[in-house]
Amino acid sequence: MYLTGIADEASQDIEGQINATRELGWNAIESRFVNGKNLHDLDEESFESVCRAIDGSGVHINAFGSAIGNWGKDVRDDFSITQGEIDRAIPRMKRLGAKFIRIMSYKVLD
């Protein structure tokens, strides 16, 4: 068993997230946002910067806290938006060794 947390609640930047995680004595982050963007929405250079910070830090990304199907999206929206997030998330999960992804449910229709 291990503890993990959504570290963007401690810091927006990845270095601060790593430090907060280590201060707790934990070694895993459920990564959601870095510098205000979801991991699957970061540009390639920013994502590689996250990977470099994680590599050798003693902390790993155990799960993606994705924006897939979240409350900010309408279930009637074009599904290609969601498909694009999935398509970007999978290779990034593989790169970081994350085995889990958290998805939400679309907002409730009025």
Locate the predicted segments by residue.
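N-terminal pre-domain/capping segments
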Residues: M1-F100
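Short, intrinsically disordered, charge-balanced linker/junction segments flanking boundaries
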Residues: S105-D110
